[in-house]
């Protein structure tokens, strides 16, 4: 993390955030025992975060140097942004049959109204890595990207983090584009620009080298540096301006669906030929499109106008 900070503060901040999550989990686990409704419906995201994302955000917001006591308010603020809990109660008027006895000793049934309470509990995990773009200045977002790209020079601190595999122990595959493909001057310029950012971390909403990129921000930036001028588009927006092609060539775009929970196009990369793409995964890297993962999400190839 921030290498100038003490381990006790880094570990303490992570522990404090985990304590907030544990409290929320206990609240949900005991919900039916601590509330008195007739019926419950739960739609709950998993409660989880990555410690490097958390501490990179904290370091960027506090300019690198902080103590645990100084960031407790920040931790609570981030927690409140990440987890959105809603509890809605619907009251239905229902009827039950009650047997009564009249003055002559005869039994008879009547329908008696009563309130029936149905509770709907929803927990949305907004994903902590999506929070920075909504609350940081460009300078802060740049610092966040820097901390994430190096894991704060402390990959030893949280060895179970998924980012250890992504950035340290299981780095993305290398790929060399055949020289003959670079005879196309336009593609050569695209590839030269795109390869400048190999290894940059994925930053949700990022769209420049200073902040790093997300998938569509990366593609938009590269092509706008190479003669296009369509501005910053999302993955769906890029798809919308492309012409679909069943015979992709280097420099075309490749689109995917279902890589995360969103409607329409969810991911985009730059096709470089021979079944490979260069894209802003995490980090920016080459990827083999023939892998089972990418094949299962592949939607279309597109050519920019």
Predicted regions and their residues:
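Second-shell loop/turn segments in exported
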Residues: 176-181, 202-209, 258
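Catalytic cysteine-centered active-site loop
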Residues: 197-250
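...with weaker cross-activation on analogous glycine-rich loops/strands in unrelated enzymes
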Residues: 228-287
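Short beta-strand-to-coil "C-cap" segments at the C-terminal boundary of structured domains/repeats
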Residues: 302-305
């Amino acid at each position: 993390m921030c290498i100038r900070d003490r381990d006790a503060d880094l570990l303490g901040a992570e522990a404090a955030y985990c304590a907030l999550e544990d409290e929320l989990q206990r609240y949900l686990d005991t919900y039916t025992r601590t509330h008195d409704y007739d019926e419950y419906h739960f739609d709950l995201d998993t409660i989880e975060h990555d410690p490097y994302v958390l501490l990179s955000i904290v370091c960027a917001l506090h300019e690198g140097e902080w103590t645990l006591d100084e960031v407790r308010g920040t931790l609570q603020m981030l927690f409140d942004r990440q987890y959105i809990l809603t509890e809605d109660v619907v009251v239905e008027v229902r009827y039950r049959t009650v047997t009564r006895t009249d003055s002559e000793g005869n039994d008879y049934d009547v329908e008696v109204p009563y309130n029936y309470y149905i509770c709907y509990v929803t927990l949305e995990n907004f994903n902590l890595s999506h929070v920075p773009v909504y609350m940081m200045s460009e300078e802060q977002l740049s610092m966040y990207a820097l901390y994430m790209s190096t894991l704060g020079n402390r990959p030893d601190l949280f060895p179970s983090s998924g980012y250890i595999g992504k950035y340290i122990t299981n780095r993305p595959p290398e790929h060399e584009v055949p020289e003959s493909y670079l005879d196309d001057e336009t593609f050569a310029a695209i590839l030269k620009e795109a390869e400048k950012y190999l290894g940059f971390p994925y930053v949700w909403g990022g769209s420049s080298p200073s902040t790093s990129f997300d998938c569509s921000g990366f593609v938009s930036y590269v092509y706008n540096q190479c003669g296009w001028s369509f501005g910053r588009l999302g993955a769906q927006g890029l798809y919308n301006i492309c012409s679909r092609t069943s015979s992709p060539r280097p420099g075309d775009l490749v689109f995917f669906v279902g890589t995360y929970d969103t409607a329409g196009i969810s991911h985009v990369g730059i096709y470089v030929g021979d079944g490979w793409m260069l894209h802003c995964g995490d980090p920016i890297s080459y990827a083999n499109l023939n892998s089972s993962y990418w094949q299962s999400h592949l939607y279309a190839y597109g050519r920019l106008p």
